[in-house]
Amino acid sequence: SDLIFTDDWRSFPRPPLVAHIIWEGEDVYVINNHYKCCGNGIIEDDEDDEEYRRLQAIKYTKDYFENSLVNKNLVLVGDFNDELSDEKTNNIYWDFISDNSNYRFVDLFIACNQSTDWSYPSWPSHLDHILISNELFNNVNFVQTIKLEQFFSGSWHEYNNIISDHRPVGLSL
């Protein structure tokens, strides 16, 4: 495992972790991220703007994929802290979304459907995503938000206090 972008705290306050794994004899690179939180939903041309910082992180991540991990099995996961369903002008993911022959957010259908399935129910919003490269498009079995609070006697309140304010999003290949 390696940390990337360790020298760019503005775009990556928490450097992404790249894990190289072998899955069914294939090399797979899983990149876990936690992008900058908060903001007002509008990308402003200001290096301190939260959406601008996330947009830069997305651009650098895509460049990293296209220069360092060309034609590799890629899975980008984590807390992206932004909505996939934003309009194009304020959608930090547009570089990936518009490049749909090479990349796919496999949880887009969750983001565009009922809030009961979203990953961040206390807001409510869907901020945790999974992006895959085209090498894995045909390997997706299912994607879902995992409602772990169902396994706690205190339901969401207990899960939120003990584990996280986010639900995990799972991908089966």
Model-derived regions, located:
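Short, solvent-exposed loop/turn and secondary-structure capping segments
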Residues: 1, 31, 41-45, 86-90, ...
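Acidic/histidine-rich helix-loop elements
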Residues: 39-53
